[in-house]
Amino acid sequence: MEAYFDNSATTKVLDCVKDAVVDAMCVNYGNAAAKHRKGVEAENLIREAKKAIADTLKVQEKEILFTSGGTESNNTALIGTALANRRAGKHLITTGVEHPSIYNTMSFLEEMGFEVTYLPVDHLGHISLEDLEKAIREDTILVSVMYVNNEVGAVEPIEAISQCIKKKNPKTLFHVDAIQAYGKYKIRPKKQGIDLLSVSGHKIHAPKGVGFLYIRDGVKIRPILFGGGQQKGMRSGTENVPGCVGLGVAAREAYKDFDARIEKLYTLRERLIAGLILLGGVTINGSEDRTNAPQIVSASFEGVRSEVLLHALEDKGVYVSSGSACSSNHPGISGTLKGIGVKKELLDSTIRFSLGDLNVEEEVDYAIGVLGELLPVLRRYQMK
Protein backbone atom coordinates (compact mmCIF):
# COMPACT_ATOMS: atom_id res chain seq x y z
CA MET A 1 0.00 0.00 0.00
CA GLU A 2 1.09 3.59 -0.60
CA ALA A 3 0.11 6.66 1.37
CA TYR A 4 1.09 10.06 -0.03
CA PHE A 5 1.07 12.65 2.76
CA ASP A 6 3.16 15.37 1.12
CA ASN A 7 0.38 17.36 -0.52
CA SER A 8 1.71 20.67 0.80
CA ALA A 9 4.82 20.04 -1.29
CA THR A 10 2.87 19.16 -4.42
CA THR A 11 -0.31 17.38 -5.51
CA LYS A 12 -1.27 14.88 -8.18
CA VAL A 13 -2.80 16.54 -11.25
CA LEU A 14 -6.52 15.75 -11.55
CA ASP A 15 -7.71 13.91 -14.67
CA CYS A 16 -9.99 16.81 -15.67
CA VAL A 17 -7.04 19.19 -15.34
CA LYS A 18 -4.77 16.90 -17.35
CA ASP A 19 -7.35 16.65 -20.16
CA ALA A 20 -7.70 20.44 -20.34
CA VAL A 21 -3.92 20.91 -20.35
CA VAL A 22 -3.39 18.35 -23.12
CA ASP A 23 -6.09 20.02 -25.22
CA ALA A 24 -4.38 23.40 -24.78
CA MET A 25 -1.04 21.85 -25.75
CA CYS A 26 -2.16 19.80 -28.74
CA VAL A 27 -5.38 21.36 -30.11
CA ASN A 28 -5.59 25.01 -29.03
CA TYR A 29 -1.83 25.44 -29.06
CA GLY A 30 -1.58 28.97 -30.45
CA ASN A 31 0.42 31.84 -28.98
CA ALA A 32 -2.04 34.06 -27.12
CA ALA A 33 -0.29 37.14 -28.54
CA ALA A 34 -0.81 36.05 -32.17
CA LYS A 35 -3.48 37.85 -34.23
CA HIS A 36 -4.76 34.82 -36.17
CA ARG A 37 -7.50 32.41 -35.12
CA LYS A 38 -5.20 30.07 -33.18
CA GLY A 39 -3.92 33.02 -31.18
CA VAL A 40 -7.42 34.29 -30.49
CA GLU A 41 -8.49 30.82 -29.32
CA ALA A 42 -5.53 30.69 -26.93
CA GLU A 43 -6.29 34.19 -25.65
CA ASN A 44 -9.90 33.16 -25.02
CA LEU A 45 -8.72 30.15 -23.01
CA ILE A 46 -6.61 32.42 -20.81
CA ARG A 47 -9.56 34.76 -20.34
CA GLU A 48 -11.78 31.85 -19.31
CA ALA A 49 -9.15 30.66 -16.82
CA LYS A 50 -8.89 34.14 -15.31
CA LYS A 51 -12.66 34.28 -14.96
CA ALA A 52 -12.75 30.90 -13.22
CA ILE A 53 -10.11 32.06 -10.72
CA ALA A 54 -11.66 35.49 -10.22
CA ASP A 55 -15.04 33.87 -9.50
CA THR A 56 -13.55 31.84 -6.62
CA LEU A 57 -12.32 35.07 -5.00
CA LYS A 58 -15.24 37.32 -6.03
CA VAL A 59 -12.86 39.76 -7.72
CA GLN A 60 -12.42 41.18 -11.23
CA GLU A 61 -10.68 39.22 -13.98
CA LYS A 62 -8.33 42.14 -14.61
CA GLU A 63 -7.03 41.80 -11.05
CA ILE A 64 -5.57 38.33 -11.75
CA LEU A 65 -1.95 38.15 -12.97
CA PHE A 66 -0.68 34.75 -14.12
CA THR A 67 2.83 33.83 -12.92
CA SER A 68 5.11 30.79 -12.94
CA GLY A 69 4.09 29.88 -9.38
CA GLY A 70 4.11 30.94 -5.76
CA THR A 71 7.72 32.10 -5.65
CA GLU A 72 7.27 34.48 -8.57
CA SER A 73 3.96 35.71 -7.18
CA ASN A 74 5.61 36.51 -3.84
CA ASN A 75 8.63 38.14 -5.49
CA THR A 76 6.40 40.27 -7.71
CA ALA A 77 4.23 41.34 -4.79
CA LEU A 78 7.15 42.36 -2.59
CA ILE A 79 9.66 43.78 -5.05
CA GLY A 80 7.01 45.29 -7.32
CA THR A 81 5.24 47.21 -4.56
CA ALA A 82 8.48 48.18 -2.80
CA LEU A 83 9.90 49.77 -5.95
CA ALA A 84 6.62 51.43 -6.93
CA ASN A 85 5.99 52.95 -3.49
CA ARG A 86 9.49 53.76 -2.20
CA ARG A 87 8.85 57.50 -2.31
CA ALA A 88 6.15 56.96 0.31
CA GLY A 89 8.51 54.98 2.54
CA LYS A 90 11.02 52.16 2.71
CA HIS A 91 9.71 50.19 5.68
CA LEU A 92 8.16 46.72 5.33
CA ILE A 93 6.78 44.26 7.89
CA THR A 94 6.55 40.47 7.80
CA THR A 95 6.76 37.60 10.28
CA GLY A 96 9.66 35.47 11.42
CA VAL A 97 8.06 32.27 10.09
CA GLU A 98 7.53 33.02 6.41
CA HIS A 99 8.29 30.86 3.38
CA PRO A 100 11.81 31.31 1.91
CA SER A 101 10.31 33.10 -1.11
CA ILE A 102 9.19 35.85 1.28
CA TYR A 103 12.09 35.78 3.72
CA ASN A 104 14.82 35.79 1.06
CA THR A 105 13.05 38.46 -0.98
CA MET A 106 12.85 40.63 2.12
CA SER A 107 16.58 40.07 2.63
CA PHE A 108 17.18 41.23 -0.95
CA LEU A 109 15.11 44.37 -0.32
CA GLU A 110 17.16 45.06 2.81
CA GLU A 111 20.26 44.95 0.62
CA MET A 112 18.50 47.48 -1.64
CA GLY A 113 18.13 49.90 1.26
CA PHE A 114 14.70 48.98 2.61
CA GLU A 115 14.08 48.33 6.30
CA VAL A 116 12.20 45.19 7.35
CA THR A 117 10.58 44.40 10.70
CA TYR A 118 10.12 40.69 11.49
CA LEU A 119 7.29 39.96 13.92
CA PRO A 120 7.62 37.01 16.33
CA VAL A 121 4.89 34.39 16.77
CA ASP A 122 3.48 32.57 19.78
CA HIS A 123 3.67 28.82 20.46
CA LEU A 124 0.85 28.18 17.99
CA GLY A 125 2.44 30.25 15.22
CA HIS A 126 0.25 33.35 15.47
CA ILE A 127 1.43 36.95 15.42
CA SER A 128 0.27 39.47 18.01
CA LEU A 129 -1.98 42.24 16.67
CA GLU A 130 -0.53 44.47 19.38
CA ASP A 131 2.99 43.82 18.07
CA LEU A 132 1.81 44.54 14.54
CA GLU A 133 0.16 47.81 15.50
CA LYS A 134 3.31 48.97 17.29
CA ALA A 135 5.45 48.07 14.27
CA ILE A 136 3.41 50.01 11.70
CA ARG A 137 4.86 53.45 10.98
CA GLU A 138 4.07 56.39 8.74
CA ASP A 139 6.66 55.11 6.24
CA THR A 140 5.43 51.48 6.28
CA ILE A 141 4.51 50.67 2.69
CA LEU A 142 3.77 46.94 2.92
CA VAL A 143 2.86 44.20 5.39
CA SER A 144 3.21 40.59 4.20
CA VAL A 145 1.74 37.70 6.20
CA MET A 146 1.29 34.02 5.36
CA TYR A 147 -2.38 32.94 5.61
CA VAL A 148 -1.58 29.30 6.49
CA ASN A 149 1.91 28.37 7.65
CA ASN A 150 3.35 25.74 5.34
CA GLU A 151 5.09 23.78 8.11
CA VAL A 152 2.70 23.68 11.07
CA GLY A 153 -0.59 24.86 9.55
CA ALA A 154 -1.08 27.89 11.80
CA VAL A 155 -3.85 30.15 10.46
CA GLU A 156 -3.45 33.90 10.84
CA PRO A 157 -6.52 36.13 11.45
CA ILE A 158 -6.26 37.84 8.07
CA GLU A 159 -9.26 40.15 8.34
CA ALA A 160 -8.25 41.32 11.83
CA ILE A 161 -4.69 41.93 10.60
CA SER A 162 -6.00 44.00 7.69
CA GLN A 163 -8.21 46.07 9.99
CA CYS A 164 -5.24 46.71 12.27
CA ILE A 165 -3.10 47.84 9.31
CA LYS A 166 -5.70 50.11 7.74
CA LYS A 167 -6.60 51.68 11.09
CA LYS A 168 -2.96 52.55 11.85
CA ASN A 169 -1.93 53.54 8.31
CA PRO A 170 -4.57 53.36 5.54
CA LYS A 171 -1.87 53.76 2.87
CA THR A 172 -0.01 50.59 3.90
CA LEU A 173 -0.56 47.70 1.48
CA PHE A 174 -1.37 44.20 2.73
CA HIS A 175 0.03 41.14 0.93
CA VAL A 176 -1.08 37.63 1.82
CA ASP A 177 0.79 34.46 0.88
CA ALA A 178 -2.23 32.17 0.42
CA ILE A 179 -0.37 29.29 -1.19
CA GLN A 180 -1.42 26.81 1.53
CA ALA A 181 -4.79 28.48 2.11
CA TYR A 182 -6.32 28.68 -1.36
CA GLY A 183 -8.80 25.83 -1.78
CA LYS A 184 -8.89 25.27 1.99
CA TYR A 185 -10.57 28.56 2.95
CA LYS A 186 -13.13 30.78 1.26
CA ILE A 187 -10.97 33.81 0.54
CA ARG A 188 -12.62 37.16 -0.20
CA PRO A 189 -9.92 39.80 -0.76
CA LYS A 190 -12.41 42.68 -0.95
CA LYS A 191 -14.15 41.72 2.30
CA GLN A 192 -10.94 40.77 4.10
CA GLY A 193 -9.02 43.88 3.06
CA ILE A 194 -6.32 42.07 1.08
CA ASP A 195 -4.44 44.14 -1.52
CA LEU A 196 -2.25 41.37 -2.98
CA LEU A 197 -2.62 37.59 -2.76
CA SER A 198 -0.26 34.83 -3.95
CA VAL A 199 -1.38 31.36 -5.10
CA SER A 200 0.48 28.38 -6.59
CA GLY A 201 -1.16 25.92 -8.97
CA HIS A 202 0.58 22.69 -8.05
CA LYS A 203 -0.73 22.86 -4.47
CA ILE A 204 -4.31 22.42 -5.77
CA HIS A 205 -3.89 19.63 -8.36
CA ALA A 206 -2.85 21.93 -11.22
CA PRO A 207 0.47 21.54 -13.10
CA LYS A 208 3.76 22.80 -11.72
CA GLY A 209 5.05 26.05 -13.17
CA VAL A 210 1.91 28.17 -12.95
CA GLY A 211 0.34 30.39 -10.29
CA PHE A 212 -1.28 33.76 -9.95
CA LEU A 213 -1.07 37.01 -8.06
CA TYR A 214 -4.24 38.91 -7.20
CA ILE A 215 -3.54 42.64 -7.39
CA ARG A 216 -6.35 44.89 -6.19
CA ASP A 217 -7.29 47.41 -8.83
CA GLY A 218 -5.51 50.67 -8.04
CA VAL A 219 -2.49 49.17 -6.25
CA LYS A 220 0.79 50.76 -7.35
CA ILE A 221 3.12 47.98 -8.46
CA ARG A 222 5.98 47.66 -10.92
CA PRO A 223 6.70 44.62 -13.10
CA ILE A 224 9.84 42.62 -12.36
CA LEU A 225 9.97 40.93 -15.79
CA PHE A 226 10.42 42.95 -18.97
CA GLY A 227 10.01 42.04 -22.61
CA GLY A 228 7.10 41.88 -25.02
CA GLY A 229 4.57 43.51 -22.72
CA GLN A 230 2.22 40.56 -22.20
CA GLN A 231 -0.45 40.77 -19.49
CA LYS A 232 -0.73 44.53 -19.97
CA GLY A 233 3.00 44.96 -19.41
CA MET A 234 2.90 43.49 -15.91
CA ARG A 235 4.49 40.15 -16.76
CA SER A 236 6.29 39.91 -20.08
CA GLY A 237 6.89 36.55 -21.71
CA THR A 238 4.78 34.21 -23.83
CA GLU A 239 1.81 33.13 -21.74
CA ASN A 240 1.81 29.54 -20.50
CA VAL A 241 -1.59 28.75 -21.98
CA PRO A 242 -1.73 25.06 -20.92
CA GLY A 243 -0.66 25.95 -17.38
CA CYS A 244 -3.17 28.79 -17.11
CA VAL A 245 -5.95 26.55 -18.43
CA GLY A 246 -5.04 23.81 -15.95
CA LEU A 247 -5.01 26.28 -13.08
CA GLY A 248 -8.43 27.59 -14.08
CA VAL A 249 -9.92 24.09 -14.04
CA ALA A 250 -8.18 23.22 -10.75
CA ALA A 251 -9.45 26.45 -9.17
CA ARG A 252 -13.04 25.54 -10.01
CA GLU A 253 -12.54 22.02 -8.65
CA ALA A 254 -10.96 23.36 -5.44
CA TYR A 255 -14.23 25.03 -4.47
CA LYS A 256 -16.68 22.33 -5.59
CA ASP A 257 -18.44 20.57 -2.67
CA PHE A 258 -16.26 22.78 -0.50
CA ASP A 259 -17.77 22.15 2.94
CA ALA A 260 -17.81 18.36 2.50
CA ARG A 261 -14.20 18.35 1.28
CA ILE A 262 -12.95 20.38 4.23
CA GLU A 263 -14.90 18.25 6.70
CA LYS A 264 -13.26 15.14 5.22
CA LEU A 265 -9.80 16.70 5.59
CA TYR A 266 -10.42 17.66 9.21
CA THR A 267 -11.73 14.16 9.96
CA LEU A 268 -8.58 12.62 8.46
CA ARG A 269 -6.40 15.09 10.37
CA GLU A 270 -8.06 14.26 13.67
CA ARG A 271 -7.72 10.53 12.99
CA LEU A 272 -4.02 11.00 12.20
CA ILE A 273 -3.35 13.08 15.33
CA ALA A 274 -5.16 10.60 17.58
CA GLY A 275 -3.12 7.74 16.14
CA LEU A 276 0.17 9.61 16.49
CA ILE A 277 -0.48 10.47 20.13
CA LEU A 278 -1.27 6.83 20.95
CA LEU A 279 2.17 5.82 19.63
CA GLY A 280 3.84 7.63 22.54
CA GLY A 281 6.84 9.94 22.44
CA VAL A 282 5.15 12.11 19.81
CA THR A 283 4.51 15.85 20.16
CA ILE A 284 2.07 17.68 17.87
CA ASN A 285 3.39 21.13 16.94
CA GLY A 286 0.82 23.90 16.72
CA SER A 287 -2.87 23.55 17.38
CA GLU A 288 -4.52 20.12 17.41
CA ASP A 289 -8.04 21.51 16.97
CA ARG A 290 -9.88 23.06 14.04
CA THR A 291 -8.32 26.47 14.49
CA ASN A 292 -5.45 24.92 12.54
CA ALA A 293 -5.52 24.33 8.77
CA PRO A 294 -7.29 21.08 7.84
CA GLN A 295 -4.45 19.55 5.83
CA ILE A 296 -1.26 19.94 7.90
CA VAL A 297 0.05 17.98 10.89
CA SER A 298 3.54 18.68 12.25
CA ALA A 299 4.77 16.01 14.65
CA SER A 300 8.05 15.60 16.55
CA PHE A 301 9.25 12.06 17.34
CA GLU A 302 11.47 11.68 20.39
CA GLY A 303 14.72 9.81 19.78
CA VAL A 304 14.51 9.65 15.97
CA ARG A 305 16.06 11.98 13.41
CA SER A 306 13.51 13.23 10.91
CA GLU A 307 15.55 12.28 7.84
CA VAL A 308 16.01 8.72 9.09
CA LEU A 309 12.29 8.38 9.79
CA LEU A 310 11.37 9.93 6.43
CA HIS A 311 13.37 7.34 4.49
CA ALA A 312 12.19 4.46 6.68
CA LEU A 313 8.60 5.49 5.96
CA GLU A 314 9.42 5.85 2.27
CA ASP A 315 10.60 2.23 2.19
CA LYS A 316 7.12 1.26 3.41
CA GLY A 317 5.33 3.42 0.83
CA VAL A 318 4.50 6.33 3.15
CA TYR A 319 5.58 9.71 1.79
CA VAL A 320 6.02 12.68 4.12
CA SER A 321 8.25 15.74 4.46
CA SER A 322 10.94 16.71 6.95
CA GLY A 323 10.48 20.42 6.18
CA SER A 324 9.40 22.83 3.49
CA ALA A 325 9.95 21.10 0.14
CA CYS A 326 10.93 24.44 -1.35
CA SER A 327 14.02 24.54 0.83
CA SER A 328 14.60 20.92 1.84
CA ASN A 329 17.70 20.60 -0.35
CA HIS A 330 19.40 23.08 1.97
CA PRO A 331 19.73 21.32 5.33
CA GLY A 332 19.11 23.45 8.36
CA ILE A 333 16.85 23.78 11.35
CA SER A 334 13.41 25.21 10.58
CA GLY A 335 12.95 28.83 11.59
CA THR A 336 9.25 28.13 12.05
CA LEU A 337 9.85 25.33 14.56
CA LYS A 338 12.29 27.54 16.44
CA GLY A 339 9.82 30.41 16.26
CA ILE A 340 7.01 28.47 17.91
CA GLY A 341 9.33 27.19 20.64
CA VAL A 342 9.81 23.53 19.73
CA LYS A 343 12.30 21.98 22.16
CA LYS A 344 15.88 21.98 20.90
CA GLU A 345 16.16 18.19 21.04
CA LEU A 346 13.06 17.83 18.83
CA LEU A 347 13.99 20.34 16.12
CA ASP A 348 15.69 17.67 14.02
CA SER A 349 13.04 15.05 14.81
CA THR A 350 10.04 16.63 13.13
CA ILE A 351 7.92 15.33 10.26
CA ARG A 352 5.18 17.14 8.33
CA PHE A 353 2.16 15.16 7.18
CA SER A 354 0.07 17.07 4.64
CA LEU A 355 -3.27 15.63 3.60
CA GLY A 356 -5.12 16.04 0.33
CA ASP A 357 -8.45 15.40 -1.32
CA LEU A 358 -7.29 12.01 -2.62
CA ASN A 359 -6.33 10.60 0.80
CA VAL A 360 -8.57 8.10 2.61
CA GLU A 361 -8.86 6.72 6.16
CA GLU A 362 -7.16 3.44 5.24
CA GLU A 363 -4.00 5.35 4.32
CA VAL A 364 -3.96 7.11 7.68
CA ASP A 365 -4.39 3.81 9.50
CA TYR A 366 -1.66 2.21 7.40
CA ALA A 367 0.78 5.04 8.18
CA ILE A 368 0.08 4.78 11.91
CA GLY A 369 0.61 1.02 11.77
CA VAL A 370 3.92 1.45 9.95
CA LEU A 371 5.07 4.05 12.48
CA GLY A 372 4.15 1.68 15.30
CA GLU A 373 6.50 -0.91 13.80
CA LEU A 374 9.33 1.46 12.90
CA LEU A 375 9.65 3.74 15.91
CA PRO A 376 10.79 1.16 18.52
CA VAL A 377 13.41 -0.19 16.10
CA LEU A 378 14.71 3.23 15.05
CA ARG A 379 14.83 4.48 18.63
CA ARG A 380 16.85 1.48 19.76
CA TYR A 381 19.22 1.89 16.82
CA GLN A 382 19.73 5.63 17.34
CA MET A 383 20.29 5.27 21.07
CA LYS A 384 23.30 3.00 20.49
Protein language model regions, located:
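Pyridoxal 5′-phosphate
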Residues: 1-384
